[in-house]
Amino acid sequence: MDSKFEHTPACGCLGRRNFLKMAGAATAVGIGGGSLLLAEEARADALTKEQRDKLTPEQIIKAMKKGNKRFRSGERKERNYLREQKASASGQYPAAALLTCIDSRAPAEVIMDLGIGDIFNCRVAGNVENPDILGSLEFACKLAGAKVMLVMGHTACGAIKGAIDNAELGNLTGLLAKIKPAVEATTYAGERSAKNYAFVNTVARKNVEMTVANIRKDSPVLAELESKGSIEIVGAMYNLETGAAEFFD
């Protein structure tokens, strides 16, 4: 990498103590760069293949949880997106593949403090799977080496509300039909209405759980990778009000 981007004790940007602290922190996690697992005081950079390949699925999930904690505390990593763009231009080695909703308030890279090159992100209303999505996830995990496959829903999801209300609109009708099984499978004692946010959020969670199950059922490629321990398929819910991402056990 171009030396003009590198920090050293002599550059004046950092005191010697802080520089050594940063270097020691990076060594402690077994990497010298990469935005996903660097210590909080270090600057972010693009993941390399060597760095990604050393990570376990559990470490990647832990890193995403820590990133969400930083997002909620307002202490996100210092980023130079131009630097990340240049560092990742010759190749990409994302650690995870995500299936998330298109909702503008739930951008995974932002809410988990991730950078360019950290993840693949498939976005579709209601975070539902289909053959094209499955093919994309298979590419991400089997061919490109991602080690975590995360399905993330969110609270107050408009697609969930539409499925509950049996909304119909062009091609959206068919998409919402994929969510209706989650509506039907949700056990709820209160008002089963799109106006009841507690019910909407309960359905959204069930939808994530069923999507995870469908991915395992409909993608032998991903199911085999998980059975071998090469990847972990998990679900999560993002809370629009609190900013917290809850990973399912």
Regions found by a protein language model. Name each.
Residues 1-14:
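N-terminal secretory signal peptides
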Residues 147:
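Short acidic/polar active-site loop segments enriched in Thr and Asp
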Residues 11, 20-26, 32, 44-91, ...:
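Divalent-metal-activated hydrolytic enzyme cores
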Residues 104-105, 154-159:
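Gly/Ser/Thr-rich loops at beta-strand to alpha-helix junctions
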Residues 102-132:
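Active-site cofactor/substrate anionic-group-binding motifs, chiefly glycine-
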Residues 99-101, 123, 150-154, 234-239:
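Short beta-strand segments
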